[in-house]
Each structure stands twice: as structure tokens, then as C-alpha cells.
UniProtKB/Swiss-Prot annotation:
Acts as a component of the general transcription and DNA repair factor IIH (TFIIH or factor B), which is essential for both basal and activated transcription, and is involved in nucleotide excision repair (NER) of damaged DNA. TFIIH has CTD kinase activity and DNA-dependent ATPase activity, and is essential for polymerase II transcription. GO terms for cellular component: cytosol; nucleotide-excision repair factor 3 complex; nucleus; transcription factor TFIIH holo complex; transcription factor TFIIK complex. GO terms for molecular function: cyclin-dependent protein serine/threonine kinase activator activity; RNA polymerase II general transcription initiation factor activity; ubiquitin protein ligase activity; zinc ion binding. It comes from Schizosaccharomyces pombe (strain 972 / ATCC 24843) (Fission yeast). This is RNA polymerase II transcription factor B subunit 3. One of the nine subunits forming the core-TFIIH basal transcription factor. Also interacts with skp1 and with the mcs2-mcs6 complex. PROSITE patterns: ZF_RING_1, ZF_RING_2. It holds the Pfam family zf-C3HC4_5. NCBIfam families: cdk7. A zinc finger (RING-type) spans 13-54. The gene is pmh1. It is found in: Cytoplasm; Nucleus.
Length: 318
């Protein structure tokens, strides 16, 4: 028996001391008000008549039978943290699109996490609960709208998953039917060959060669059809991509950073030194001879518009 099975057998109800060894169908339940365990029989015995105080010594919480449920996690602290986070996420359910900036959304998430942390570790619980209730009261309409939108998105996602599963199932069934038809065709060809060999007076070798050629023709036709359908789908996807955007990418929005004094053509000048350097393995990544040539040209023409005499006259006048 594994550790989990041994743990379940050894579990006991803290109130009546019943265990799973004598009662394999025993269920241990918890209430999210205090997370104290007790068996289903004790819950029925204590809380059937109405709300009552938790029978665990030192706990003064008033519990209701409708809120008891089975524990999901072995650690009660983790169980409580998950419940707190579910409750807070249902109230603070705003999305990033509802904020003017990313910083405002991050501040909102930080505030929500602080409130969640305080409730999980019981820090300023009364003050934190008051903030949560005040927020829920002030944003009741937006909370309901966001919940409805989330539910609609979940429904759409579930419908898409169902549709995808249905399409996969139909594709599998179609493949099985096609495989069965192909198998039946092959059996018919084999039976026809046997029949011709038994009843016909023709040369058996010619009959076998004819059947082999027919099989090859069928295989070629099937492969051609599959290739055509595959190429058609590829061409369709390519056409759709081209139709979406035919504008070439330009990082400068079409602007060209050229010079009005010269034009550069890499085919009219041969630089033997840089040609040799460009083939070195350490300069492969990002090294271009054109950049070196353009830099030299820009340096040569950079002062061509500089009017020294006009500048001297301005200095004398000042």
C-alpha cells in the first residue's frame, strides 16, 4: 500500500474517532469558516437542525451544514489560501484594458495581492475585510459585467474545444473509412487475379504484370491527388498571407538616409583588403564592406557645405 493509501486508512474523525479502517466509506468534511475536520456523520448529527458552533475546542465559529465539503488538499493552510484567492479574484476581476496605463494596472494588482496576503496570514483582518466589502459595494456593476464577460469567454472556449474534438473525430473516422475502402479494393484485385489465373487461358505472367501495373497506377493517382490537395492548401495559405499585407517593411517609414553629393554602388569598386577581411570567421556576423565604404564617403563629403568666409563675417560682426 502506498503512502497516500496508508494515510487515508489512518485518518480519523477528531470528534468521534471513527477511522477508514473500520468504515471505508467515511468522508471527512471541512467548513471554509474554520477548516476543522469532522466526519459526515458528525456533521449530520450536529448541524442538521440548523447553524451551530464548531465542536472543535477553542473554536467559536458558527457553522452551517450547507457549507461543508470534502478537502481537496492535504494541508489545510493551502486549502484556505486557495479559497481566499478564489474569493478575491471573483471580486477584483478587472482587466488591463480598463486602466489608462500599464503602471496603473500593476498598482491595482499589487494592491490586490496585499489584501490577499493579509487575509491568508491573518494580518489586520478586520481592516482588510472592510476594504474588500467597500470595494465590492462601490464596483458592484463592473464586477458583474466582468464576471459575465469571463463566463462568455469560457463558454466560447469550451465550444471551440468541443468543435475541435469533433473535427478530429470526423477526420479519424474518414481515415478509417478510406483505409477500409483501399483494403477492399486490394482484395478485389487479388480475387480477380486468382479468378483470371484459374479460368483464363492467358499467360499467367502477363496477368500478374497487368495487375501490378494497375496497382501502380492506383497508387500514383492517390499520391497525385494528395499532393495536389496539399499544394493547393499551401498556395491558398500563401495567397492569404500576401493578401493580408503587401507593403514592404521599412524601419524608417520609407525615408532614405542618403547623400545628395554621391551615390554608392558596390559593383564599381573592388577593395582587395576588405574583401579579404570580410571572409574571416570572426567578422561574419553583421560585417559589411559597404558600411566601411559609406563611412569613408560621408567623412569626405561632411564639410562640403561649410562656408568658412560667412562664419568669419558673423564672428566679426558680433
Amino acid at each position: 500500500m502506498d503512502d497516500e493509501g496508508a494515510r487515508k486508512v489512518d485518518e480519523k474523525c477528531p470528534l468521534c474517532q471513527a477511522d477508514r479502517y473500520l468504515n471505508p466509506n467515511m468522508k471527512l468534511l471541512i467548513n471554509p469558516e474554520c477548516y476543522h475536520k469532522m466526519c459526515e456523520s458528525c456533521v449530520d448529527r450536529i448541524f442538521t437542525t440548523g447553524p451551530a458552533q464548531c465542536p472543535t475546542p477553542g473554536c467559536n465559529k458558527i457553522l452551517r451544514k450547507a457549507k461543508f465539503r470534502e478537502q481537496t488538499f492535504e494541508d489545510a493552510q493551502i486549502e484556505r489560501e486557495v479559497d481566499v484567492r478564489k474569493r478575491i479574484s471573483r471580486i477584483f476581476n478587472k482587466g488591463q484594458q480598463e486602466f489608462d496605463s500599464l503602471q496603473a494596472y500593476n498598482d491595482y494588482l499589487e494592491e490586490v495581492e496585499i489584501l490577499t496576503f493579509n487575509l491568508i496570514y491573518k494580518i489586520d483582518v478586520e481592516e482588510t475585510e472592510e476594504k474588500v466589502k467597500q470595494y465590492e459595494k462601490q464596483n458592484r456593476d463592473s464586477i458583474a459585467a466582468n464576471s459575465a464577460r469571463a463566463a462568455a469567454e469560457a463558454r466560447i472556449l469550451a465550444q471551440n474545444e468541443i468543435l475541435l474534438k469533433r473535427q478530429k473525430q470526423e477526420a479519424r473516422e474518414a481515415a478509417i473509412r478510406e483505409h477500409q475502402k483501399e483494403k477492399e479494393r486490394r482484395e478485389q484485385v487479388e480475387q480477380q487475379i486468382i479468378f483470371d489465373l484459374a479460368t483464363s487461358g492467358k499467360d499467367p505472367n502477363k496477368i500478374i504484370q497487368l495487375s501490378d501495373s494497375l496497382k501502380k497506377q492506383q497508387e500514383n493517382i492517390a499520391s497525385s491527388v494528395s499532393n495536389i490537395s496539399r499544394s493547393s492548401s499551401i498556395l491558398l495559405s500563401d495567397v492569404q498571407q500576401v493578401a493580408e499585407d503587401t507593403t514592404p517593411f521599412s524601419p524608417l517609414a520609407g525615408e532614405k538616409d542618403g547623400s545628395k553629393y554621391f551615390s554608392y554602388s558596390k559593383n564599381t569598386y573592388q577593395d582587395l583588403y576588405l574583401e579579404k577581411v570580410s571572409h574571416e570567421p570572426g567578422r561574419k556576423c553583421g560585417f559589411r564592406i559597404e558600411d566601411c565604404h559609406l563611412r569613408c564617403l560621408y567623412e569626405a563629403f561632411s564639410g562640403i557645405d561649410y562656408d568658412l568666409e560667412s562664419l568669419k563675417k558673423l564672428e566679426v560682426a558680433s
